[in-house]
Amino acid sequence: MIKTIIEFFSLLTPSQRRRFYTLQILLVIMTFAEVASIFSITPFMALVGDPSILQKEGFLRILYEKSNLDEPYKFIFYLGFVVLAILIISALISIFITWRLAMFATKIGVEIGDRLYSHYLNRDWLFHTMKSSSNLTEKISTETYRITHMFLLPLMYMNARLFLTLFVFLILLVYDPIVSIICLIVFSITYIIIIKLARARLEINSKNISAMFLERFKLMSDSFGGIKEVLLLDKSSEFKKSFIKAGNKLAYSEGLNRAIALVPRYFMELIGFASMIALVLYLIANSKGNLGLLLPILSIYAIAGVKLLPALQQIYNSIVTIQGNLSAYESIREDLININMDIEQKVEDNQQVWSKHNEISLKNITFNYPHKKSFALKDVSLVIKPNTTVGFVGTSGSGKSTLIDVIIGLIKPQQGEITIDGTPLISQNLRTWQNKIGIVPQVIFLTEGTISENVAFGIPQDLINHEQVKKVLKLAYLEEWVLGLENGVHSKVGERGIQLSGGQKQRIGIARALYYEADVLVFDEATSALDGITEKAIMRAINDFTGKKTLIMIAHRLTTVQKCDKIFMMNNGSIVDSGTYQQLLKKNEQFKKM
């Protein structure tokens, strides 16, 4: 556990570590304040029990003489107010520093979530094809919450109680070494035995909690994402059973962890009170009838016990809570390491200025996906002239979409070179190249926002250029439909565009690509899921840009690529033929069958 904590703090930012070290100084101040409050009561109680102490040698006599008070009881009265003031100041200091501890831990948790979110968004397309969005969401929302409330906060509180426990023990050690050492041995051995016995169960529960949180996230994502199929196929009961089953496992693991953390408290309180009774009996037996001497001694041990027992329980509780949630850190450990590496390796865009007329050239492009034996692309070479319309056809799995992902910079090939107007496409100029591209996929992702927010995707509402929105909606043949809506471009589209037809979604996708004034438009089977009439309407909108922009189209149906200047036919990751629509019809039998 200690190695994990050290590693975790090594992955924090320098600013976060500085804040942590500052808090340790505050914890020392809080410890002094609490110790002062504890041991200010002891001399006061001794004086109340025996006012004659003022006549004996000691610091109370010095204070009494300097106070110029003529009555011992007046001195005791004012001393009581001083002790009360010390207690109030100590409480205020503890409240403030405890608040700072909580704010630090929660702030760190939020910042870790922010870093993870930013890290995942900055990862390449291949990363997201191999990762579950439910898993990423669960890490950002649930695991960072666990790190905040079940890892960092307990750690902060444990540190606070450790400082107090050590300081009080040192004072008691000076006051009575034998009793202090005996108490230390008894309490330490008891807690160590409990922690050793509970460790294995806590580790199992920790992993179960992470697994069940992820399972419930996945079930929610799958059931809500496919709600139409769930309702139609009457599968809601199966999802509910799985969700409840995972929830019961989660509740059992979390409940058992809490019980392991809380139950020993009563056993330790029993030991604590038994020790106090034994101490009282021991002091009575050795007081020789002078019970008045016992009051200050009992006061110091009683007050120390009141502070130490909860402190020891807090330390134990924190250790158990941290051990029971180490899986939360383990689940994001690799990501935090990668984040630090990303910061060191960040690539600056050189702001390459591409010409308006972009000739796209691919030379000997080869690529295969991780953990796949066969090549997705194999020695592909082609040239796309500016402001031409090209199509890619082929059976499923022939490499069409992968090739487009290479052209638009989502995938980096293992071999070969891509050039734009003769300039190699590299990391430093990739961003500016992608700024010139608009893509219309087969399935248009729509947020649960307005039409204008979906057209100007990713732009805050107050920064949207509504004139540009209206312009591109007109180009996408959506103007008439939008004008017929009560709220126009401010109309909501529903979650994932559920209130729109397939054709309307595709047109919004086209408008989105045009909003950013892209010079290259990519249509990735954009009409394959549409009926014939709607497809013709969409193709009319697309064909309006012929000769004005570079159009790249992936298609299954040949009707989509009839007007292309050039068509590339693909099979098994290679270009097996190319030509115009009419040329391929004449010379390629496979093309005719498509």
Task: Name these PLM-found stretches.
Residues 24-89, 172-180, 185, 289-295:
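Transmembrane helix-loop-helix hairpins at lipid-water interfaces of multipass membrane proteins
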Residues 129-135, 208-256, 324, 331-332, ...:
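Loop segments that connect adjacent transmembrane helices in multi-pass transporters
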